[in-house]
Amino acid sequence: MADNTLRIKPVANTDRPAIGRFIASRWGATVIVHGTVFRPAELLGLVAVRDGRLAGLLTYDVSGDSLEIVTLDAVTPTGGVGSALVTAVADEARRRQVRRLNVTTTNDNLDALRFYQRREFRLFAVRPGAVDESRRLKPQIDEIGLYDIPIRDEIELVRDLAIG
């Protein structure tokens, strides 16, 4: 009988090869956010496992009083994996005494905007032309994105965390 329980665990060094392949298949080797080049396979992260298989992955970077979600991927959307990973990273942020979570998405990613706003994130900043600038570092970033919307801008969302 299969164990359908979703387990969330920190990324371990033994997970890195599989995570590297997973990230590369979805994002390429690098992700560029607000002009910063991240290598998600090398970042801190949380892995969601169901039935012994990778169900999702969240990678993040901690800087000062902020924990930035760099990537969030669920193998099967709308199955609760993304929500579970965001809840787990919020718990990790509180444990680290971090005051806020932030995430950046692109103007075409309406699904991400909906997802994060439904999980207590608020719009914080719009960076017009930021993706156009990122293409100088990563030319393979698509020009046209979801829903046939031209990808041009970054939108940052923030969730304040109650500490204590």
Regions found by a protein language model. Name each.
Residues 5-7:
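Extreme N-terminal starter segment of soluble prokaryotic enzymes
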